[in-house]
Swiss-Prot record:
Name of the protein in question: 5'-methylthioadenosine/S-adenosylhomocysteine nucleosidase
Keyword field: Amino-acid biosynthesis, Hydrolase, Methionine biosynthesis
Record-listed substrate binding positions: G78, I156, M177, E178
List of catalytic residues: E12 (proton acceptor), D201 (proton donor)
Statement: the UniProt record of this protein carries the keyword Protease: no
Name of the top EC class for this enzyme: hydrolase
Record's function text: Catalyzes the irreversible cleavage of the glycosidic bond in both 5'-methylthioadenosine (MTA) and S-adenosylhomocysteine (SAH/AdoHcy) to adenine and the corresponding thioribose, 5'-methylthioribose and S-ribosylhomocysteine, respectively. Also cleaves 5'-deoxyadenosine, a toxic by-product of radical S-adenosylmethionine (SAM) enzymes, into 5-deoxyribose and adenine.
Example of a GO cellular component annotation carried by this entry: cytosol
GO terms classed as biological process: L-methionine salvage from methylthioadenosine; L-methionine salvage from S-adenosylmethionine; nucleoside catabolic process
Record GO terms (molecular function): adenosylhomocysteine nucleosidase activity; methylthioadenosine nucleosidase activity
E.C. numbers: 3.2.2.9
Amino acid sequence: MTIGIIGAMEEEVELLKNSMPSVEEIVIGGAKFYVGEIAGKEVVLLESGIGKVNAALGTTLMADRFKPEVIINTGSAGGMAEGLAVGDVIISDRLAYGDVDVTEFGYTYGQVPRMPAFYQGDAVLLKKAETIYREYFAASENKAVYGLVVTNDSFIMRPDQHETIRTFFPDVKAVEMEAAAIAQVAYQFDIPFLIIRAISDLANQEATISFDEFIHLAARQSATCIIELLKTI
């Protein structure tokens, strides 16, 4: 089994890359692929670049060239739900776009025409993650949360951005910039997927300072969770 893992930034894939005993690097169209093993599993690790287009391009290349049987997305996110703290982990059971509006044609806000309104994480992978992280976080000050993640091509920090997202997605748990695009490509290629992100900021007016300070913590938390998950796949 080949497992695809995708992170947008170097910081988000560094720990995973360093976990590979040997690595083959392949660059296609600016997307950086690292081929090796993690926890005894054959892995293709992608540093896609930031944003939906980069994520979709990289995921498509991964699906076409490397034929992964599972795709997992790692990285950071901005917390939107009450009670979330930096270092908490969000496991997404649903994903949506927060900046797509074709409602004039009868689509749900966030829905790309002829695509689902929400992309569902793989039920088997979600169950594995739930079991693992219940034990992993039992003695931790951080926690794992399950729910809706919303993807935007903007870094969310302003009150007006918050208001728009909460208006259309009142149960949103976190926001970020790639996951729904990855999920859409996985959906179109019929590849099971799971999104695991760690909170780097609280998507407020201090978010840029928090992100710069805590991106490495969030990346480490997310990557560590994925390594634990790989042991069970």
